[in-house]
Curated annotation (Swiss-Prot):
Name of the protein described by the UniProt record: Urease subunit beta
Record lineage: Bacteria, Pseudomonadati, Pseudomonadota, Gammaproteobacteria, Oceanospirillales
This protein's UniProt keywords: Cytoplasm, Hydrolase
The species this protein was found in: Chromohalobacter salexigens (strain ATCC BAA-138 / DSM 3043 / CIP 106854 / NCIMB 13768 / 1H11)
Gene: ureB
GO biological process: urea catabolic process
A Pfam family assignment: Urease_beta
Length: 108
């Protein structure tokens, strides 16, 4: 092996295999593009994006880590989301959760 060399497996690699997935339609009603990153808590996305926020609580984009999806002004599209896993604690973003996603009485 050469330092820094990649040894890749042949074929396709499925990201997040076996995870529950949901699809939501999203519309950008703003006048500027909006980009959402791979691990952003989707329910807390820019208010100019119109979609069912309650349905997306605890979910993030089903895209490769470090990538994003861009919504152009006036654009409407479907996106696939997957749930956060692990401890399911969310902090920051727009500060709508600030703790455990599954906590009783928690709102976003």
């Amino acid at each position: 092996m050469i330092p820094g060399e990649y040894q890749l497996q042949d074929g396709e690699i499925e990201l997040c295999a076996g995870r529950e997935r949901i699809t939501v339609e999203v519309a950008n009603t703003g006048d500027r593009p909006i980009q959402i990153g791979s691990h952003y808590h989707f329910a807390e996305a820019n208010p100019a994006l119109i979609f069912d926020r309650d349905k997306t609580r605890g979910y993030r984009l089903d895209v490769a880590a470090g990538t994003a999806i861009r919504f152009e002004p006036g654009q409407r599209r479907e996106v696939t989301l997957i749930p956060f896993v692990g401890r399911r604690h969310v902090y920051g973003f727009r500060q709508a959760v600030m703790g455990a996603l599954d906590e009783k009485g928690a709102t976003s």
